[in-house]
Amino acid sequence: TVAIIGGGPIGICCGLIARTAGASKIVVFEVNPDRAASLRETFGFTVIDPTKPGAVAEAIAMTDGLGFQRIYETSASIPGFKMVTALGRVRAHAVIIGITKEPAPLDTWKMMHEEMRLTTIRVHQQYAYAAALELVKSGSLDRELMAMITDEFELADAQKAFEFCLNDTKHIKVLIKS
C-alpha cells in the first residue's frame, strides 16, 4: 500500500512506479482540484484532498486501518510533512523527496514506536537512472508518461511558457520544443 503526498510530476512518477512494482493500493493526496481530476481520470489513482477534515483517517480506512507500507512526500509542504508519520503503519518506509523552504517537523515519537524507516532523496544514484531508463525503454509506461505533458510551447515562446506555468492550475508538465 502506497500513499503519495503531492500529485505533481514526481508524485505521478512515484505512483506509476509503485503500480508497476505491484502496489495493491495507491492513494495520492492533492490539493489542486484540477490536478486531482487528472490524477483520477488520466492515471487512475485514488485521490484525497489533504485539506479536507478526516483526510488521513479516510486514507487509513482504505488499508483496513493498518496504514500505508510506503509513503512518498513529494509536495515539499509543511502540511505534507506532518502527514508522513500519520499515514504510516508499523515498519512503514517513508521517502522524503520534496525539499521544503524551511525546517519541517516530523513525529519522531511515532516513528520510534512504529519502527518506521525514513529515507531522504536529493541526489540520485547511477543505479536509479539505469532502472528508470530500462522502465522507459520497455514502453510499458508510454501512455502515462506522454499524458503528463499537458501543454507544449515553441522555444521562441519560452517566456510565455514560464508565465503559463505560474498562472495555470490545470497543467502537469509543460514541454518547450526547439
Regions found by a protein language model. Give the residues of each.
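Residues at the starts of beta-strands that form the adenosine-phosphate
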Residues: 1, 24-26, 93, 117
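Adenosine-nucleotide cofactor-binding segment
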Residues: 4-7, 19-81
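Glycine-rich Rossmann-fold phosphate-binding loop(s) that bind the pyrophosphate
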Residues: 6-9, 99
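Residues forming the Rossmann-fold NAD(P)(H) cofactor-binding site
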Residues: 12-13
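Residues in the short beta-alpha loop(s) of Rossmann-like NAD(P)-binding domains
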Residues: 31-32, 100, 124
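C-terminal hydrophobic helical "lid"/dimerization subdomain
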Residues: 82-86, 126, 130-178
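Helix-to-beta-strand junctions that scaffold the AdoMet/dcAdoMet cofactor pocket
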Residues: 88-90
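Rossmann-fold dehydrogenase core element
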Residues: 92-95, 106-147
